Amino acid sequence: MNTITLTARPEALTFAPEQSALIVVDMQNAYASQGGYLDLAGFDVSSTAPVIENIKTAVAAAREAGMTIVWFQNGWDSDYLEAGGPGSPNFHKSNALKTMRRCPELHGKLLAKGGWDYQLVDELTPLPGDIVLPKPRYSGFFNTPLDSMLRARNIRHLVFTGIATNVCVESTLRDGFFLEYFGVVLEDATHQAGPPFAQQAALFNIETFFGWVSDVQSFCDALSPEALARIA
Protein backbone atom coordinates (compact mmCIF):
# COMPACT_ATOMS: atom_id res chain seq x y z
CA MET A 1 0.00 0.00 0.00
CA ASN A 2 1.36 3.39 -1.02
CA THR A 3 1.96 6.02 1.64
CA ILE A 4 2.21 9.80 1.52
CA THR A 5 4.16 12.19 3.71
CA LEU A 6 2.29 15.25 4.95
CA THR A 7 4.26 18.29 6.07
CA ALA A 8 3.06 19.08 9.59
CA ARG A 9 4.03 20.38 13.00
CA PRO A 10 5.83 19.23 15.09
CA GLU A 11 6.99 16.73 12.46
CA ALA A 12 5.84 15.27 9.16
CA LEU A 13 3.29 12.47 9.22
CA THR A 14 3.34 9.44 6.91
CA PHE A 15 0.19 7.45 6.14
CA ALA A 16 -1.71 5.61 3.43
CA PRO A 17 -4.64 7.56 1.95
CA GLU A 18 -6.75 4.38 1.80
CA GLN A 19 -6.34 3.95 5.55
CA SER A 20 -7.13 7.57 6.37
CA ALA A 21 -10.23 9.71 6.66
CA LEU A 22 -10.95 13.39 6.18
CA ILE A 23 -13.27 14.51 8.98
CA VAL A 24 -15.48 17.53 8.27
CA VAL A 25 -16.83 18.75 11.59
CA ASP A 26 -20.14 20.60 11.82
CA MET A 27 -20.00 22.73 8.68
CA GLN A 28 -23.61 23.67 9.25
CA ASN A 29 -25.42 26.97 8.89
CA ALA A 30 -25.42 27.02 12.69
CA TYR A 31 -21.66 27.48 12.77
CA ALA A 32 -20.71 29.10 9.48
CA SER A 33 -23.58 31.33 8.34
CA GLN A 34 -24.94 34.71 9.32
CA GLY A 35 -28.18 34.14 11.17
CA GLY A 36 -27.04 30.74 12.44
CA TYR A 37 -26.68 29.70 16.05
CA LEU A 38 -23.13 30.97 16.63
CA ASP A 39 -23.96 34.32 15.08
CA LEU A 40 -27.14 34.68 17.15
CA ALA A 41 -25.24 33.67 20.29
CA GLY A 42 -22.79 36.53 19.76
CA PHE A 43 -19.84 34.76 18.13
CA ASP A 44 -18.09 36.22 15.08
CA VAL A 45 -18.70 34.16 11.92
CA SER A 46 -17.76 36.91 9.46
CA SER A 47 -14.53 35.18 8.38
CA THR A 48 -15.83 31.67 7.75
CA ALA A 49 -16.08 31.99 3.94
CA PRO A 50 -12.36 31.24 3.32
CA VAL A 51 -12.64 28.25 5.66
CA ILE A 52 -15.54 26.88 3.62
CA GLU A 53 -13.53 27.23 0.40
CA ASN A 54 -10.49 25.57 1.96
CA ILE A 55 -12.58 22.65 3.17
CA LYS A 56 -14.07 22.32 -0.31
CA THR A 57 -10.53 22.12 -1.70
CA ALA A 58 -9.43 19.56 0.89
CA VAL A 59 -12.50 17.40 0.28
CA ALA A 60 -11.84 17.34 -3.47
CA ALA A 61 -8.20 16.32 -2.93
CA ALA A 62 -9.13 13.63 -0.41
CA ARG A 63 -11.85 12.23 -2.65
CA GLU A 64 -9.50 12.04 -5.64
CA ALA A 65 -6.93 10.18 -3.52
CA GLY A 66 -9.43 7.60 -2.29
CA MET A 67 -9.71 8.77 1.30
CA THR A 68 -12.87 8.15 3.29
CA ILE A 69 -14.78 11.38 3.95
CA VAL A 70 -16.82 11.77 7.13
CA TRP A 71 -19.29 14.63 7.64
CA PHE A 72 -20.64 15.48 11.07
CA GLN A 73 -23.76 17.44 11.94
CA ASN A 74 -24.18 18.51 15.54
CA GLY A 75 -27.67 18.83 16.95
CA TRP A 76 -30.72 17.23 18.45
CA ASP A 77 -34.36 16.31 17.89
CA SER A 78 -36.77 19.24 17.64
CA ASP A 79 -37.95 18.66 21.21
CA TYR A 80 -34.32 18.70 22.43
CA LEU A 81 -34.70 15.46 24.35
CA GLU A 82 -31.31 14.36 23.00
CA ALA A 83 -29.75 17.54 24.37
CA GLY A 84 -30.37 16.49 27.97
CA GLY A 85 -32.40 18.25 30.62
CA PRO A 86 -31.25 20.11 33.75
CA GLY A 87 -29.56 16.92 34.95
CA SER A 88 -27.09 17.14 32.06
CA PRO A 89 -24.11 19.53 32.05
CA ASN A 90 -24.84 20.01 28.34
CA PHE A 91 -28.10 21.74 29.33
CA HIS A 92 -26.12 24.30 31.30
CA LYS A 93 -23.08 24.76 29.02
CA SER A 94 -24.49 24.56 25.48
CA ASN A 95 -24.61 28.11 24.17
CA ALA A 96 -27.34 27.09 21.74
CA LEU A 97 -29.59 25.94 24.56
CA LYS A 98 -28.75 28.99 26.66
CA THR A 99 -29.51 31.29 23.73
CA MET A 100 -32.92 29.68 23.24
CA ARG A 101 -33.74 30.03 26.92
CA ARG A 102 -32.79 33.69 26.68
CA CYS A 103 -34.74 34.15 23.44
CA PRO A 104 -37.74 31.78 23.55
CA GLU A 105 -38.76 32.73 20.01
CA LEU A 106 -35.72 30.76 18.80
CA HIS A 107 -36.87 27.52 20.43
CA GLY A 108 -37.01 24.75 17.86
CA LYS A 109 -34.80 26.64 15.42
CA LEU A 110 -31.24 26.23 16.70
CA LEU A 111 -29.48 22.93 15.95
CA ALA A 112 -32.81 21.15 15.48
CA LYS A 113 -32.64 18.25 13.04
CA GLY A 114 -34.43 19.04 9.81
CA GLY A 115 -34.08 22.79 10.14
CA TRP A 116 -31.95 25.30 8.23
CA ASP A 117 -29.60 25.79 11.19
CA TYR A 118 -28.81 22.06 11.25
CA GLN A 119 -28.17 21.76 7.52
CA LEU A 120 -24.69 21.77 6.00
CA VAL A 121 -23.80 24.98 4.20
CA ASP A 122 -24.77 25.00 0.52
CA GLU A 123 -21.16 25.03 -0.66
CA LEU A 124 -20.36 21.66 0.93
CA THR A 125 -22.29 18.61 -0.23
CA PRO A 126 -21.62 14.98 0.70
CA LEU A 127 -21.59 12.48 -2.16
CA PRO A 128 -22.72 8.85 -2.24
CA GLY A 129 -20.15 6.77 -0.42
CA ASP A 130 -19.34 9.49 2.10
CA ILE A 131 -20.20 8.88 5.74
CA VAL A 132 -22.66 11.39 7.23
CA LEU A 133 -23.19 11.16 10.97
CA PRO A 134 -25.28 13.11 13.48
CA LYS A 135 -23.70 13.74 16.86
CA PRO A 136 -25.38 14.90 20.07
CA ARG A 137 -22.31 16.30 21.85
CA TYR A 138 -19.04 18.02 21.02
CA SER A 139 -17.07 14.84 20.33
CA GLY A 140 -17.78 12.89 17.17
CA PHE A 141 -16.88 9.68 19.01
CA PHE A 142 -19.53 10.07 21.73
CA ASN A 143 -22.74 8.07 21.10
CA THR A 144 -21.96 7.63 17.39
CA PRO A 145 -20.74 4.64 15.33
CA LEU A 146 -17.63 6.53 14.17
CA ASP A 147 -15.09 4.30 15.92
CA SER A 148 -16.53 1.03 14.63
CA MET A 149 -16.93 2.41 11.10
CA LEU A 150 -13.31 3.56 11.01
CA ARG A 151 -11.97 0.30 12.42
CA ALA A 152 -13.97 -1.72 9.88
CA ARG A 153 -12.11 0.21 7.18
CA ASN A 154 -8.70 -0.17 8.88
CA ILE A 155 -8.48 3.61 9.20
CA ARG A 156 -5.91 4.90 11.68
CA HIS A 157 -5.18 8.46 10.52
CA LEU A 158 -7.74 11.26 10.74
CA VAL A 159 -7.42 14.65 9.05
CA PHE A 160 -9.64 17.25 10.70
CA THR A 161 -11.41 20.30 9.28
CA GLY A 162 -14.43 22.28 10.44
CA ILE A 163 -15.89 24.47 13.15
CA ALA A 164 -15.22 25.08 15.94
CA THR A 165 -11.53 24.34 16.33
CA ASN A 166 -11.57 24.81 20.10
CA VAL A 167 -14.78 22.90 20.72
CA CYS A 168 -15.97 20.06 18.48
CA VAL A 169 -12.83 19.68 16.35
CA GLU A 170 -10.51 19.51 19.35
CA SER A 171 -12.93 17.34 21.33
CA THR A 172 -13.16 14.77 18.52
CA LEU A 173 -9.42 14.78 17.88
CA ARG A 174 -8.71 14.30 21.60
CA ASP A 175 -11.09 11.37 21.87
CA GLY A 176 -9.50 9.88 18.77
CA PHE A 177 -6.09 10.20 20.43
CA PHE A 178 -7.35 8.20 23.41
CA LEU A 179 -8.60 5.54 20.98
CA GLU A 180 -5.19 5.28 19.25
CA TYR A 181 -5.99 7.34 16.14
CA PHE A 182 -3.41 9.69 14.67
CA GLY A 183 -5.09 13.09 14.31
CA VAL A 184 -3.92 16.04 12.23
CA VAL A 185 -5.82 19.30 11.86
CA LEU A 186 -5.65 21.54 8.79
CA GLU A 187 -5.43 24.89 10.52
CA ASP A 188 -6.71 27.04 7.63
CA ALA A 189 -9.71 24.75 7.19
CA THR A 190 -10.92 25.39 10.74
CA HIS A 191 -12.37 28.33 12.64
CA GLN A 192 -12.76 28.99 16.34
CA ALA A 193 -15.77 29.90 18.44
CA GLY A 194 -14.52 32.96 20.28
CA PRO A 195 -11.56 35.33 19.95
CA PRO A 196 -8.47 34.48 17.87
CA PHE A 197 -6.54 33.30 20.92
CA ALA A 198 -9.01 30.39 21.18
CA GLN A 199 -7.81 29.17 17.79
CA GLN A 200 -4.18 29.61 18.80
CA ALA A 201 -4.68 27.77 22.08
CA ALA A 202 -6.48 24.86 20.43
CA LEU A 203 -3.76 24.46 17.81
CA PHE A 204 -1.09 24.65 20.52
CA ASN A 205 -2.83 21.92 22.51
CA ILE A 206 -3.17 19.70 19.46
CA GLU A 207 0.39 20.20 18.24
CA THR A 208 1.93 19.76 21.69
CA PHE A 209 -0.18 17.06 23.30
CA PHE A 210 -2.67 15.28 21.04
CA GLY A 211 -1.72 15.37 17.36
CA TRP A 212 -0.32 17.33 14.47
CA VAL A 213 -1.08 20.59 12.65
CA SER A 214 -0.87 21.12 8.90
CA ASP A 215 -2.60 23.24 6.23
CA VAL A 216 -4.67 22.73 3.11
CA GLN A 217 -1.89 23.46 0.62
CA SER A 218 0.42 20.92 2.25
CA PHE A 219 -2.41 18.39 2.30
CA CYS A 220 -3.17 18.92 -1.39
CA ASP A 221 0.52 18.78 -2.29
CA ALA A 222 0.92 15.45 -0.50
CA LEU A 223 -2.10 14.04 -2.34
CA SER A 224 -1.34 15.55 -5.75
CA PRO A 225 -1.23 13.19 -8.75
CA GLU A 226 2.47 14.01 -9.11
CA ALA A 227 3.20 13.06 -5.50
CA LEU A 228 1.14 9.89 -5.74
CA ALA A 229 2.86 8.95 -9.02
CA ARG A 230 6.27 9.20 -7.36
CA ILE A 231 5.31 6.59 -4.77
CA ALA A 232 3.32 4.31 -7.08
Swiss-Prot record:
Active site residues according to the UniProt entry: 26 (proton acceptor), 135, 168 (nucleophile)
Q: One Pfam family, short name please? A: Isochorismatase
InterPro entries (UniProt xref)? Isochorismatase-like_dom, Isochorismatase-like_hydrls, Isochorismatase-like_sf, RutB
What superkingdom does the record give? Bacteria
Q: Which UniProt keywords apply?
A: Hydrolase
Q: Name one GO molecular function term.
A: hydrolase activity, acting on carbon-nitrogen (but not peptide) bonds, in linear amides
For this chain, the family text in UniProt reads: Belongs to the isochorismatase family. RutB subfamily.
The protein in question is named: Ureidoacrylate amidohydrolase RutB
Which reactions fall under this protein's catalytic activity?
(Z)-3-ureidoacrylate + H2O + H(+) = (Z)-3-aminoacrylate + NH4(+) + CO2; (Z)-3-ureidoacrylate + H2O = (Z)-3-aminoacrylate + carbamate + H(+); (Z)-2-methylureidoacrylate + H2O + H(+) = (Z)-2-methylaminoacrylate + NH4(+) + CO2
Q: What class of enzyme is it?
A: hydrolase
Q: What does this protein do?
A: Hydrolyzes ureidoacrylate to form aminoacrylate and carbamate. The carbamate hydrolyzes spontaneously, thereby releasing one of the nitrogen atoms of the pyrimidine ring as ammonia and one of its carbon atoms as CO2.
HAMAP family registered for this protein in UniProt: RutB
Q: So what EC number does this one have?
A: 3.5.1.110
Q: Name one GO biological process term.
A: nitrogen utilization
